[in-house]
């Protein structure tokens, strides 16, 4: 009788443990079911980065005084400042400035400590390339302004996803019935179809 009761007790404990594990698993599953989808049909849809996003560095050649503060504060001594000393004026003359974004960790120290504010962080994050050497930007490439997603006709910027609604701290509190993050390819095509027709069949007004 004692052995039988021990077996029953062991069976009850195992059943209780299995039920607990099932409950924990279904809790995670149903929690994910309540979340909003996060799919974005890139590159037809792009998220607008947050206000303090640390993207590609923008550089203004005319403001730079070749002080090399950016090199000293960089954790990996990345910026390359090429300058010569003008013996007549006894001042530095900047010749070239470059940053290799294949090595950069985007910490923002160079931007923070620049005395002339010639460096700034942009929201540009599309730096993919087939050759890593193309990620070494010189002063000309660094001086180009980043492309604006909101003015690109081939891209639908998701403005409503840049920030959470006012007063909402947890993204799980946003109901699933709100605006979807991503759209299906056919929905993207339907949205772009009128614009594609305008490109294929442009309207030409006769000369008066």
UniProtKB/Swiss-Prot annotation:
Cross-referenced InterPro entries: 4Fe4S_Fe-S-bd, 4Fe4S_Fe_S_CS, NADH_quinone_OxRdtase_chainI, NDHI
Record key words, sorted: 4Fe-4S, Iron, Iron-sulfur, Membrane, Metal-binding, NAD, NADP, Plastoquinone, Quinone, Repeat, Thylakoid, Translocase
GO biological process, one term: photosynthesis, light reaction
GO molecular function: 4 iron, 4 sulfur cluster binding; iron ion binding; NADH dehydrogenase (ubiquinone) activity; quinone binding
EC number: 7.1.1.-
Occurrences of domain 4Fe-4S ferredoxin-type (ranges): 55-84, 95-124
Subcellular location: Cellular thylakoid membrane
Comment on bound cofactor: Binds 2 [4Fe-4S] clusters per subunit.
Protein name, per record: NAD(P)H-quinone oxidoreductase subunit I
Organism this protein belongs to: Prochlorococcus marinus subsp. pastoris (strain CCMP1986 / NIES-2087 / MED4)
